[in-house]
């Protein structure tokens, strides 16, 4: 039975769940632009206030995937997405983007799904443009990029055109809503493995269980206890791991992997150019915190991609990819490949 928008709003006011099929229906109304801005704003605010359930988030992600422009990838093995919800307020350089180059250099295929900076000084799209990558690719071109270079960047506005129907509402509300956590759940290439950073500790257990419902294979959802939506060097990191259909939650520390715990303060940047400089420094094997945090995150991604048997093994592979120059070479390879499609 379908639910009316008014009934859904009443449900959120009473802190009651909107069931799966009802949420599918509501989300389709939003994505088609069939809800008034007032009603759309009220419902997504009501969901936030009552706290979205795993079922509601999974249903919303299912619809967002339905409406996406998909990237068809032939070979799903060792295929991973490295993504963060953003919104952690840390203003660090683009660690997950740097990790993409290292992860690909070590043999994984990476489909990175990202956007321009909203809360951050430099989103993944901003730093890739600063590096010379053409981010404005069609779906078939992204698929070719993944096949050829082991990396593909999916610029979110190109793949989620229906999001324009809620964009003005989100902008005017100016608060976090369910849409802030849907991005990492809706990779247009359908990567079955993922390293996902989140901005709040409660999201670790929630997002990993959403991915479980969505049929993912190997996922690590991470939250650095210093507030980072990455595996952190400055504190312990909470991990929710989905593997073989089962979820395990645990904590990891830099010292577990022979790394020193150091503050992430030196990783802050003011703009995409500063992020580019720090990213290239890490990939050029310059000793320092930037290289170490990229090694740690790429190592975790290699474990998620099933290239490495453990995070520790992944870190070793990441170190070798950087030291050999292969990771740095991946930057030039992606720039060269994507520039041929410049319009």
Curated annotation (Swiss-Prot):
Keyword Chaperone, does the record have it?
no
MF (Gene Ontology): anthranilate phosphoribosyltransferase activity; magnesium ion binding
Q: Which residues bind anthranilate 1?
A: 84, 115
Q: What class of enzyme is it?
A: transferase
Pathway(s) it belongs to:
Amino-acid biosynthesis; L-tryptophan biosynthesis; L-tryptophan from chorismate: step 2/5
Binding site residues for 5-phospho-alpha-D-ribose 1-diphosphate: 84, 87-88, 92, 94-97, 112-120, 124
Reaction catalyzed? N-(5-phospho-beta-D-ribosyl)anthranilate + diphosphate = 5-phospho-alpha-D-ribose 1-diphosphate + anthranilate
The Swiss-Prot or TrEMBL record lists the needed cofactor(s) as: Mg(2+)
Positions binding Mg(2+) 2 in this chain are: 229-230
InterPro entries per UniProt:
Anthranilate_Pribosyl_Tfrase, Glycosyl_Trfase_fam3, Glycosyl_Trfase_fam3_N_dom, Glycosyl_Trfase_fam3_N_dom_sf, Nuc_phospho_transferase
Per UniProt, the cofactor note for this protein states: Binds 2 magnesium ions per monomer.
A Gene Ontology annotation in the biological process aspect, one of them, is:
L-tryptophan biosynthetic process
Can you supply one Gene Ontology CC term for this chain's record?
cytosol
Looking at the keywords, is Ribosomal protein present?
no
Which NCBIfam families did the record assign?
A: trpD
The similarity annotation says:
Belongs to the anthranilate phosphoribosyltransferase family.
The record describes its quaternary structure and partners as: Homodimer.
Q: What is this protein called?
A: Anthranilate phosphoribosyltransferase
Species, as recorded:
Burkholderia cenocepacia (strain HI2424)
